[in-house]
Structure formats: structure tokens, C-alpha cells
Regions:
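Tandem CBS (Cystathionine beta-synthase) repeat/Bateman regulatory domains
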Residues: 1-167
Length: 167
């Protein structure tokens, strides 16, 4: 049985991956699950065809960042400095962290999530799902080897892709 996190080939019936320790408990369920399990384990993030991200500098005002999100109909901005990812600012950051602040007085760097967990375009959907579940994230940036933002994947994107693969 392949581990959904590291793809190590474990013995059937194992409860935990011998390589990375990830739980294999609900991954050995017969019938029904196989329809999308192969998609999750084998398809790479780049197969989802996600578009380019909207990036802003860390010194942009919070009100301007929220305006950018509204105009682009998105709920996640990638924060880049010199072309490299330094943070993420989401609608949740705006609602929870900045809701009672005078927005014009603050920069997005004051409320962004710095040094976010990232994905690579060749990571599998299983890795994306694992990182989202463990970290409690709804969005994860996709970066290249130089930490340059390529895209952002959301839990909704992954869900739609899996449902679409069911035919």
C-alpha cells in the first residue's frame, strides 16, 4: 500500500507508514474509494490547471489588499518581496485579525501569515490534502525552487478536481 504522504510502498494492512509515520488507517478501505484514490495518490498539482496567483508587496495597505481580493474575486493574496513568496493574506486574516482595526493605518505585512507552508507543482493531491488537513489551511501557495509564486491551490480547487475525475 502506497503512503498518501510520501508514496513509500508499505505492506498491506499496516496502520502506519514505515517511512514517514503517517496514518494509513483509512487508506485500506475496500470498494468505492478506489474511484478517486488513484487520482489523489498519483496526480500532481499541476494537472489541476490552476491559474496565476495575484501577488502584492508586503507594504500594501490592508484596505488596498482587500480591494484587490474583491476586484479579482479571490479570497487569498500571495505576498511577494523581490519576486519571492514571504506570506499569505486571506479573507480569514481580514475578518479575524483586522476586523476591528483602522485598516488605512496598517499594512498587509501586519496581518499576513509569514513563511507559509508551500507546495511544488509536482506534489501530489495527497500531499496537498495532507498539508491542508494538518495545518488547518484552506489555501496553500505553489512555488518554484526559488520560492517564486506560481499559483495558489484551495481546498475547494482540490475537491472540484477530485469530483471532476469521477466522471
Amino acid at each position: 500500500m502506497l503512503c498518501p504522504v510520501c508514496r513509500y510502498d508499505n505492506f498491506e494492512g499496516e496502520d502506519e507508514c514505515a517511512n514517514c509515520g503517517a496514518s494509513l488507517t483509512n487508506h485500506d478501505i475496500p470498494g468505492g474509494v478506489g474511484d478517486y484514490r488513484d487520482t489523489i495518490l498519483s496526480e500532481h498539482i499541476e494537472a489541476m490547471g490552476i491559474g496565476s496567483p495575484v501577488t502584492v508587496p508586503p507594504n500594501i495597505g490592508v484596505a488596498d489588499a482587500i480591494r484587490q481580493m474583491h476586484e479579482n474575486e479571490i479570497d487569498c493574496l500571495l505576498i511577494a518581496l523581490d519576486g519571492r513568496l514571504v506570506g499569505v493574506f486571506t479573507d480569514r486574516d481580514a475578518f479575524v485579525k483586522a476586523v476591528d482595526k483602522r485598516l488605512q493605518l496598517y499594512k498587509v505585512r501586519d496581518f499576513m501569515t509569514p513563511d507559509p507552508v508551500v507546495l511544488r507543482k509536482d506534489d501530489t493531491l495527497a500531499i496537498a490534502i495532507h498539508k491542508m488537513a494538518v495545518g488547518g489551511f484552506r489555501h496553500i501557495p505553489i512555488v518554484d525552487d526559488d520560492q517564486r509564486p506560481l499559483a495558489v491551490v484551495s481546498a475547494a480547487d482540490v475537491f472540484r478536481h477530485i469530483v471532476g475525475s469521477l466522471g
